[in-house]
From Swiss-Prot:
Expressed by the venom duct. It comes from the Eukaryota. This is Conotoxin SI.13. Disulfide bonds join C2-C16, C3-C12, C8-C15.
């Protein structure tokens, strides 16, 4: 899944 909002934050999994 994603990590936090927005889901396309740096260092997070690209979910967009």
């Amino acid at each position: 899944g994603c990590c936090g909002v927005p889901s396309c934050m740096a260092g997070c999994r690209p979910c967009c």
